[in-house]
């Protein structure tokens, strides 16, 4: 797609996909319907996570309907669409040593970013400044955020998915930060809360320590074979 390359940059292309990824072969999307038609001829079903791409859903369903008629006539052909999510979830459940190392790197980098933001926080700082500190650290290490960062001061910290991050923090406020990074497709996810002026009030400290105790107890309960 020449136009897309001009606007958005180079495309891997069919040849690049076949060479750069652990797959048997690659084909153009323009040939998708023809390839699916051919593949369905001697298949009993189709594995597809639907509602991710309307165009692909339409092609598969159209081909499936056509081949189902063939099955009624000749006794061969697909009968259903199967959601492979449970199979893929099981495959993703156990990580390889190399995957674990990447996950550790992602977690370490996110932890670094949170620590830096804590040290640079003061009672006149704005939420977006904290966001910039954290995400800037991610980018300086060749990473990127794994989800839109949440930085809420005061009452904003009580909003579960607060993404505006556009208010200034006040003296005495607690700041909640939910931010993680992604390395090679593996994401970290860390939430921490700290006082804007560097010192908890008695009530803040009491609640903070209560939550901290609960978190430590939950971590200690994470053993092989433990139920959720």
Listing of model-derived features with the role each one plays in the protein:
Residues 1-228:
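Active-site neighborhoods and metal-handling regions in enzymes and metal-associated proteins
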